[in-house]
């Protein structure tokens, strides 16, 4: 079988491949107050925050709990799953109280103006706020200097990331326009290891 590449055959294929990568752009940019947000499309819902983790459980049970797709609420075009009807009721009464910082992106990534995805099971409550991290190494690096890292993350979230397209922001800040204090994963891991000695 011979595949012919023609101008009219190549353009639709190229366009289809390019658009296939657009789903996360739409999913993570719902508009409104929660944009961008660490969300995925799942269970027939366009934007499920933190892959369905129950955001209320972090606050009320000090625990990561996976939510149930049958117990859900929508706030600012983002779907939230809950592990119980009680948690859903708490969220519905006061949703902003239970929102993760930085749209649920890795808090340590936001220190560098980079909205990396966070893992719902790697988290920390600090002063009544929920911080999500991309992994234990990211969490440990953030915790080395919480006041400084929160100040930087708040600054970059409010000045650059909030309201932006997460993909574009991530691409720019990891390639051509790094912040002056940028550190690689290896550099952060070395700092964490030295602090544990």
Segments from the language model and where they lie:
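Beta-strand cores of secreted/periplasmic/IMS beta-sandwich domains, seen most often
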Residues: 72-90
């Amino acid at each position: 079988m011979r595949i012919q590449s023609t101008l009219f055959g190549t353009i639709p294929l190229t366009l289809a491949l390019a658009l296939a990568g657009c789903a996360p752009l739409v999913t993570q940019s719902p508009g409104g107050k929660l944009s961008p947000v660490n969300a995925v499309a799942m269970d027939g819902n366009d934007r499920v925050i933190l892959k369905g983790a129950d955001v209320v459980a972090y606050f009320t049970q000090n625990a990561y709990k996976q939510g149930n797709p049958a117990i859900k609420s929508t706030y600012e075009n983002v779907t939230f799953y809950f592990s119980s009807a009680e948690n859903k009721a708490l969220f519905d009464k006061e949703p902003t109280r239970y929102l993760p910082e930085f749209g649920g992106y890795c808090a340590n990534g936001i220190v560098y103006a980079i909205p990396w995805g966070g893992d719902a099971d790697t988290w920390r409550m600090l002063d009544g706020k929920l911080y999500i991290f991309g992994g234990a190494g990211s969490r440990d690096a953030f915790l080395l200097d919480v006041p400084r890292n929160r100040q930087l993350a708040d600054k970059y979230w409010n000045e650059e990331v909030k309201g932006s397209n997460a993909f574009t922001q991530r691409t720019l800040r990891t390639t051509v326009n790094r912040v002056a204090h940028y550190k690689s994963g290896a550099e952060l891991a070395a700092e964490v290891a030295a602090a544990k000695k």
